[in-house]
Amino acid sequence: MMAYLVFLGPPGAGKGTYAKRIQEKTGIPHISTGDIFRDIVKKENDELGKKIKEIMEKGELVPDELVNEVVKRRLSEKDCEKGFILDGYPRTVAQAEFLDSFLESQNKQLTAAVLFDVPEDVVVQRLTSRRICPKCGRIYNMISLPPKEDELCDDCKVKLVQRDDDKEETVRHRYKVYLEKTQPVIDYYGKKGILKRVDGTIGIDNVVAEVLKIIGWSDK
């Protein structure tokens, strides 16, 4: 089974959750660019990591050429030979073009760019309901995945907190920024004829089933 996928969608769409589920079913690796960046800046002997860490510590945006280099390095690893699910990249048309040319150099091409459609109010409800344990980092959702005891972590019995970027005003701002930044990428894949839209409100199992259908995966 070979599938090269890009996952697009607003914060709170569930991209990481769907990618993990599809990885479990198909063995196609989930590549989260957020995770790659967190890992690379921890490596003391990595020149690229050092450069990125300096930029991030100044609070500046990492330029496309460095982001592209990090992604290229990860996609060149053996586990990505027969596919990947990219989550968090590309964020710009320039990055999308770089990804295309890199895949072309490997005689590969994207199978699909999957866009999870989730309305703003649903994103707001999902993210403002999110709580985190300040001690162990476990994430809860007060609607869909609540703790056993009200507002207390099941493991630590510590009072759960809401992250600043999960407050309503911030979530609405993040959604607006997402629309502005991602629309050109959505249009880019739409013109290429590989954009597939999935309703992100139909429940995890149904969403995963839709994506598996797109890539032609069968359990049989």
UniProtKB/Swiss-Prot annotation:
GO CC list: cytoplasm
Region annotation LID: where it falls in the sequence: 129-166
Record-listed AMP binding positions: T33, R38, E60, L61, V62, G88, Y89, P90, R91, Q95, R163, R174
E.C. designation(s): 2.7.4.3
CDD domains attached to this UniProt entry: ADK
A molecular function GO annotation: zinc ion binding
Coiled coil: none
Top enzyme category: transferase
Region called NMP, residue ranges: 32-62
PROSITE patterns referenced in this protein's UniProt entry, alphabetically: ADENYLATE_KINASE (PS00113)
Annotated compartments: Cytoplasm
Domain notes: Consists of three domains, a large central CORE domain and two small peripheral domains, NMPbind and LID, which undergo movements during catalysis. The LID domain closes over the site of phosphoryl transfer upon ATP binding. Assembling and dissambling the active center during each catalytic cycle provides an effective means to prevent ATP hydrolysis. Some bacteria have evolved a zinc-coordinating structure that stabilizes the LID domain.
NCBIfam families for the chain: adk, PRK00279.1-2, PRK00279.1-3, PRK00279.2-4, PRK14527.1
Listed HAMAP family: Adenylate_kinase_Adk
PANTHER family: NUCLEOTIDE KINASE (PTHR23359)
Protein name in the entry: Adenylate kinase
Organism: Thermotoga neapolitana (strain ATCC 49049 / DSM 4359 / NBRC 107923 / NS-E)
High-level lineage: Bacteria, Thermotogati, Thermotogota, Thermotogae, Thermotogales
